[in-house]
From Swiss-Prot:
<feature type="domain" description="Carrier">
    <location>
        <begin position="4"/>
        <end position="79"/>
    </location>
</feature>
<dbReference type="GO" id="GO:0005829">
    <property type="term" value="C:cytosol"/>
</dbReference>
<feature type="modified residue" description="O-(pantetheine 4'-phosphoryl)serine">
    <location>
        <position position="39"/>
    </location>
</feature>
<keyword id="KW-0597">Phosphoprotein</keyword>
<dbReference type="InterPro" id="IPR036736">
    <property type="entry name" value="ACP-like_sf"/>
</dbReference>
<keyword id="KW-0596">Phosphopantetheine</keyword>
<dbReference type="GO" id="GO:0017000">
    <property type="term" value="P:antibiotic biosynthetic process"/>
</dbReference>
<comment type="function">
    <text>Involved in some intermediate steps for the synthesis of the antibiotic polyketide bacillaene which is involved in secondary metabolism.</text>
</comment>
<dbReference type="InterPro" id="IPR009081">
    <property type="entry name" value="PP-bd_ACP"/>
</dbReference>
<keyword id="KW-0045">Antibiotic biosynthesis</keyword>
<protein>
    <recommendedName>
        <fullName>Polyketide biosynthesis acyl-carrier-protein AcpK</fullName>
    </recommendedName>
</protein>
<comment type="pathway">
    <text>Antibiotic biosynthesis; bacillaene biosynthesis.</text>
</comment>
<dbReference type="GO" id="GO:0000035">
    <property type="term" value="F:acyl binding"/>
</dbReference>
<dbReference type="GO" id="GO:0009245">
    <property type="term" value="P:lipid A biosynthetic process"/>
</dbReference>
<dbReference type="GO" id="GO:0016020">
    <property type="term" value="C:membrane"/>
</dbReference>
<keyword id="KW-0963">Cytoplasm</keyword>
<dbReference type="Pfam" id="PF00550">
    <property type="entry name" value="PP-binding"/>
</dbReference>
Length: 82
């Protein structure tokens, strides 16, 4: 799975949790908080993405990411090492 596909999985789940963002032009620099995701929304998005990618990683490993591009990068690295 390539980085672009992981980014697409991330966007799909963001739009499912935050349907008001459907049609938004997502950029790697976008931050979930700035997009309107509260802590519960962010946890739900992460859980859904991890399930879609069949990953089991501690959430703490994702806590340092600053934007959705960095999140996709970390997830890509985890998929490659799984």
């Amino acid at each position: 799975m390539d980085k672009q596909r992981i980014f697409e999985v991330l966007i799909t789940n963001i739009c499912e949790v935050l349907p008001e963002l459907d049609g938004h032009r997502f950029e790697p620099e976008d931050q979930l908080v700035e997009l309107g995701a509260d802590s519960v929304d962010r946890a739900e998005i992460i859980t859904m993405v991890l399930e879609d990618l069949s990953l089991k990683i501690p959430r703490i490993e994702l806590s340092g990411v600053k934007n959705i591009g960095e999140l996709a990068e970390v997830l890509y690295d985890k998929v490659q090492s799984a």
